[in-house]
A protein has these predicted regions:
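Short Lys/Arg-enriched alpha/beta "domain-start" segment
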Residues: 1-11
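Local beta-strand/beta-hairpin segments that build beta-sheet-rich folds
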Residues: 7-8, 17-21, 116-119
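Unchanged
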Residues: 41-43, 75-178
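Short acidic, gly/pro-rich beta-turn/loop elements at beta-sheet edges
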Residues: 54, 66, 144-147
Length: 193
């Protein structure tokens, strides 16, 4: 009997291999699966109960444009109606990000003590590490003040704007993404339309 067993010489394969590193996303191969790494996000639908309106973004979205470029009735559309969204920065909580994004994108400053509920986190999809927290934010009159939004200086924010929509028009909204549809449905259920 041999004192030493021969060990098969296999190259070590790391569990994670970086395929692409971008400004907003990375692609990695992990356990033989290509995975998108994107920052976690928040999605917010502010609802002004006393004014019977809610706030949405008419947002410049090149990804939607790219997907629709071969559709004759959609190829000229540059801005799409969505809820307010934003990335959670390092060290931020979802609550803090909601307050920051509301300020940056809409100019809404919430009172510091105003409480709100956040749902989540939910994974965006099966091949993405990003998780999203969602918030249907009911705002009574004295819970906020509104100023001109400072924006974050990005091209998307320069070409986008927030608009107030009457709750009477809630059933006319064309939803372009699942998160917006989810929050609009929550609003419809809340107001009983």
């Amino acid at each position: 009997m041999e004192k030493f067993t021969q060990i098969e010489d296999k190259p070590l394969v790391p569990d994670e291999v970086s395929l692409f590193n971008g400004k907003f996303l990375d692609i990695i191969n992990y356990k033989e699966t290509e995975i998108l790494q994107v920052k976690d996000k928040v999605a917010i639908l502010p609802y002004f109960r006393d004014e019977a309106t809610f706030l949405m973004r008419l947002e410049y979205l090149p990804a939607y444009q790219y997907k629709n470029m071969d559709k004759s009735n959609l190829k000229r559309i540059t801005n799409y109606l969505t809820v307010i969204t934003g990335a959670i920065e390092d060290g931020e909580t979802p609550d803090k990000t909601i307050r920051r994004e509301l300020y940056e994108e809409s100019g809404l400053l919430l009172n510091n003590l105003y409480p709100f509920e956040v749902e989540g986190p939910y994974f965006v999809d099966k091949y993405n590490t990003s998780q999203i927290w969602v918030c249907l934010l009911e705002l009574p009159v004295n819970s906020y003040r509104q100023i001109k939004p400072p924006t974050d200086g990005s091209k998307v924010e320069k070409l986008s704007k927030c608009i107030r929509v009457s709750v009477g028009d809630v059933n006319s909204i064309v939803n372009n993404d699942l998160i917006s549809k989810y929050l609009i449905t929550k609003l419809i259920n809340r107001i009983g339309q």
